[in-house]
Amino acid sequence: MAPYLQTSLIWIAYAVAVGLALFAAIVTTFTWQKPRERSAVVNTVAVVSLTSLLATVLLLPVDIALVSSTGSVHLGVNKEWATPEHVAGMLRTLQIVYYSLYSLDALLCLIVIPFAYFWYEEYDEVEEEEGTRSTGAKLWGAFKYTSGFIILVLILFFVGFFVPAAGNQKGGHLDLDYFKRLLAANKGEKALTFAVGLLVCLGTLLYVLYTSSGLALLPISFIKSAPSISAPQLSETTASALERNRERQRQLELRNGGNHDEMPSKDRRELESLVREERTLVRRARLAAEAQGEGRSWVYRTWTKICAVFRPLKLVGGILLLLVSVIVWVSMLITTIDKASNSLCKGHCGYILGQIKIFQPVNWLFLQAAKAFPVDYIIMAFLVLFFFSSSISGLATVGIRFLWVQIFQIRRGRTAPQAILIATVMMALIILGINYSIAMMAAPQYSIYGTQTFCTAEPTAHGKQPDCSEHPEMVRPCSEGFKQPLAKDICTPSVMSTFLNRVTLNWPVFGAVDFWAQVAFLAVFLIVLVTSLFRTPKLNMSELDEEAEADEEEGLLASTGRRFGATWQDITGRSGQASNQENGDN
């Protein structure tokens, strides 16, 4: 009963996490999308896709938890209930869930999302009102463009089905049972391995750009979130500028007797410039008033004050996240050096590391946390979500680009539906890169075997498990490098690590690209971190004015509700100088 209870609790926790992922996907989609350009089709596809992606990335802690539950950490042997048949059934269930989620992700990202993208592009408001184009015509137009992606999926599958695996030709020198099992795959598995391996490579390239940037920028955004001007101060500064502007307009009109037709061209140009500036200042004053809660309910004003009060906690959280980022970076650097120096077969198998030779902080932390169940699984879930959130942060900062040309911006409340769909596809590929990075670089030993250990003593009789109850020093953490025959029966690798190692062993070029991309990841993170640490956050007034103008055109000024820094001023509602004057500029 105990093993079934533990397994059930793990799956129940996963189901709850997926439910929270659905809620997060809904909030994320509606928060980032333009309110006036919302589409039911785009929203549904984006929510389902994001939920599927989060469910996929959250499956890794479940995978590790299940394989870890099969063994006794202190004795280095399988538990009584962990028979080969029971373990095989558990792994088969995990494989089914993995294959189902990855197949769903591939279907969504390569077919459904492109179809939704072209469906939205086919939409025309005039044709919709006049009824000149049928739904069937729009469906055909979207399917016509989506067919190219369907052909791409078929090509990937058939190439993987017929291309011989390079690992089969170079695997003869690998005398470890673990690697031999990785090479044993049928044609269907080989085709799927090739397709996913190629997508992992593409995702790793995006991961290098976006996740590395986000991993550095996300903590810094918490630490340096306070801009250099507060809402009360912005209101006062804007009011002063608006008063000077109108005074100058009155001077120009008095100078020319109020006759605009006889006004010199120089004065006319200056007056036109002042009028444009006045409109900008009026919009800015409205935003400052809304930021202070004027015209809003007491609930909103109270919430704004609470956020200002707890802003120091945001600073502390940013410092802690920065510490986590640095520790993860150091751990990945150590793993990179360890793999480059001590890999069993170097580039021939994608730099698979048989056993950790250098102390690795993150891996050590997981092994120590495993002593207090389920702390290690909670930390792993946090690490996975931290990488995921960092990817979103990097995507929002960098935007969707082709080379140096920005195609779409990812901004809260201003993201076009097309950008939402493209960003979802990019996040799907990045998820593959995150899975590789966490499993192979951040916590390589823990991600493969979890907390499993192996008793190196010889069994007392044939068919019996070894006994290390009186020799705890002979209990070692499981690793791919063990050559004992019983090791393969006691040490059960996670499904994710097995799949990734199969990719890198069968197609070493994928493994080489994924491995050396981690070096680029470390370099980009360091550059972005150092740069952002020495940059002072500034309030982008031009961007603020653009957003205010867009809100005014859309009639959405009531929902803007921006907050500015200067904690104490936002709490008191004063700028530290004279009280704000009424603008009367509406």
UniProtKB/Swiss-Prot annotation:
For this entry, the protein name equals Probable lysosomal cobalamin transporter
Question: What organism does the record attribute this protein to?
Answer: Pyricularia oryzae (strain 70-15 / ATCC MYA-4617 / FGSC 8958)
Where is this protein found? Lysosome membrane
Membrane spanning segments where? 10-30, 47-67, 96-116, 147-167, 191-211, 315-335, 378-398, 420-440, 509-529
Tell me which Gene Ontology terms the entry assigns under biological process. Answer: protein localization to vacuole
A single cellular component GO annotation: vacuolar membrane
Give the family from UniProt: Belongs to the LIMR family. LMBRD1 subfamily.
Keyword NAD on this protein?
no
Upper classification of the organism: Eukaryota, Fungi, Dikarya, Ascomycota, Pezizomycotina
**Positions bearing carbohydrate:** N540
Could you tell me the keywords of this UniProt record? Answer: Cobalamin, Cobalt, Glycoprotein, Lysosome, Membrane, Transmembrane, Transmembrane helix, Transport
Please verify whether the record's keywords include Transmembrane. Answer: yes
GO MF assignments: cobalamin binding
Q: What is its main location?
A: membrane
The topology of this chain with respect to the membrane is:
Multi-pass membrane protein
Name the job this protein performs.
Probable lysosomal cobalamin transporter. Required to export cobalamin from lysosomes allowing its conversion to cofactors.
